[in-house]
Amino acid sequence: MDSLALAPQVYSRKDKSLGVLVANFLTLYNRPDVDLFGLDDAAAKLGVERRRIYDVVNILESIGLVARSGKNQYSWKGFGAVPRALSELKEEGMKEKFAIVPFVAKSEMVVYEKEGEESFMLSPDDQEFSPSPRPDNRKERTLWLLAQNFVKLFLCSDDDLVTFDSATKALLNESQDMNMRKKVRRLYDIANVFSSMKLIEKTHVPETKKPAYRWLGSKTIFENRFIDGSASLCDRNVPKKRAFGTELTNVNAKRNKSGCSKEDSKRNGNQNTSIVIKQEQCDDVKPDVKNFASGSSTPAGTSESNDMGNNIRPRGRLGVIEALSTLYQPSYCNPELLGLFAHYNETFRSYQEEFGREK
């Protein structure tokens, strides 16, 4: 029983997907104080096998998010290194553009991974544009390079939509390959990781309803929750709870909402927001006692004629504040607080009456 209690919590079948695993991985290591991390440490903290962590870091390494620094050791580069890595991948992919991208839209098989020194299987008319075969065919089958080639399909294509069938035919070898199903599954893993990072999104072709992926780019990573830890430090010190006696409206939370705009704030009026007046506006304000020294706000024993006769006007910044506080009275009202204060007032008056009777 003790050994079971000390055993790390493992993922369920649903949580074993690389899309979920990479989200937990980024939550664990996407911090400004992380420079190096080990595969064994990550596997122990996330409760998965080390090979699953190895798959994650290989895919993340393909876009420059991490870099290998030693045996089972990786350095965290952060999302700031992703745009530069994508730019380098695009530059490399443009050199191979005639060998990959133009044939993806035609659903033709371009890149093949075969044993031996066999060239890419292109048509005779297209072989003059094909690059020279790479000597290291074993490296072509790595997850890292497969992820890079998958990204190149989007970076070097005129259309941001790539079907999964086209990507499979462009990157994998279907003819007489017993491991084709395994390779397709690896390509699915790569797509799931990039989808969870909001680098691409799952969709379908409107005409054929075939599964496809749309390229979103590195900007969407920063717009979503996968941002650098240093960039999110400004939001960590914002209190989530209000202090007693302050406004019920959380102004900072309203500003952080994506759907909130200046027009919406103007439409809502001054009910739940405080009025901020610039110093330039305060200098131009000339309060008039005739406008605000009336009604219930007029002190007892004063009159309009008396004030105007004596030419009494508030002076300085204090007078401006007094005038503005009278002109712009907040319309915010909490009925619960008013009821509570009325109850206290009634109780206090009853105590005064009883105390007067005793005397």
From Swiss-Prot:
The two DNA binding domains are required for binding to the E2 site. Residues 255-274, 288-313 are annotated as: Disordered. It comes from the Eukaryota. Gene3D superfamilies: Winged helix-like DNA-binding domain superfamily/Winged helix DNA-binding domain. Belongs to the E2F/DP family. Signal peptide: none annotated. It holds the Pfam family E2F_TDP. Inhibitor of E2F-dependent regulation of gene expression. Binds specifically the E2 recognition site as a monomer without interacting with DP proteins. May be up-regulating E2FA and down-regulating repressors of cell cycle progression. Promotes cell proliferation and represses cell elongation. Regulated by proteolysis via a ubiquitin-proteasome pathway. It is found in: Nucleus. Induction: Down-regulated posttranscroptionally by auxin. One of its GO terms (cellular component) is nucleus. Residues 13-78, 138-217 bind DNA. GO terms for biological process: positive regulation of cell population proliferation; regulation of transcription by RNA polymerase II; response to auxin. Disruption phenotype: Increased root length and smaller cotyledons. Reduced root meristematic zone but longer cells in the differentiation zone. Keywords: Activator, Cell cycle, DNA-binding, Nucleus, Repressor, Transcription, Transcription regulation. GO terms for molecular function: DNA binding; DNA-binding transcription factor activity; RNA polymerase II cis-regulatory region sequence-specific DNA binding. This is E2F transcription factor-like E2FD. Preferentially expressed in proliferating tissues. Highly expressed in young stalk and young flowers. Lower expression in young leaves and mature flowers. Detected in cotyledonary vascular tissues, the shoot apical meristem, the base of trichomes, the fully developed stomata, the central root cylinder and in the columella of lateral roots but not in the primary root tips or in the leaf epidermal cells. Residues 293-309 have a biased composition (Polar residues).
